[in-house]
Amino acid sequence: MDSTLIKTEVIDELAARAGVGEKVAAITERAMQGELDFQASFRERLALLKGLDESVLSDIADNLPLSEGAEKLISTLKRLGYKTAILSGGFNYFGKHLQKLLGIDYVFANELEIENGKVTGRVKGDIVDGLRKKELLKHIAQKENIALEQVIAVGDGANDLPMLSVAGLGIAFRAKPL
């Protein structure tokens, strides 16, 4: 979803609004350098969002910049009978927004914990990382009776590699260097 279906990284948008953009960027850089794994870096970045007002999520969701051609791609796939899914290490709140906007069939992402209208800095449930994306892709294919060889997956980062490796066609879109 982030930097693929949409042009931005939502966690960076949230961090900027929370006044912790530089701190989050530094943690992201450490993760890119291999100093932190995805789950550790995700939890560390998320903790910095503690106290962010829930209204910020709605504002960001309403202004998500879709990647060029995203609407046409999804509508064409839907018209041709394809099933579509968002499997994201980002946030469910924004995936669900895009699901309504574009008619996506499935959304699996991290659920932000919100209490009393504020982000707690924690996520509910398991973190959607690379291995979880792979499991979810296989689950959807099985549920829809689609052979993995017939699956197309699109991703941009190292945490997409497990998912891309099991798809019949794995596409690196705006890929980050490994």
Predicted regions and their residues:
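Active-site neighborhood of HAD-like aspartate-dependent phosphohydrolases
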Residues: 1-39, 43-44
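Generic secondary-structure signature for well-ordered alpha-helical cores
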Residues: 16-19, 47, 142, 146
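Cysteine/selenocysteine-centered motifs that mediate thiol-based redox chemistry or coordinate metal-sulfur cofactors
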Residues: 35-56, 60
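C-terminal cap/substrate-recognition subdomain and adjoining C-terminal extension
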Residues: 51, 55-178
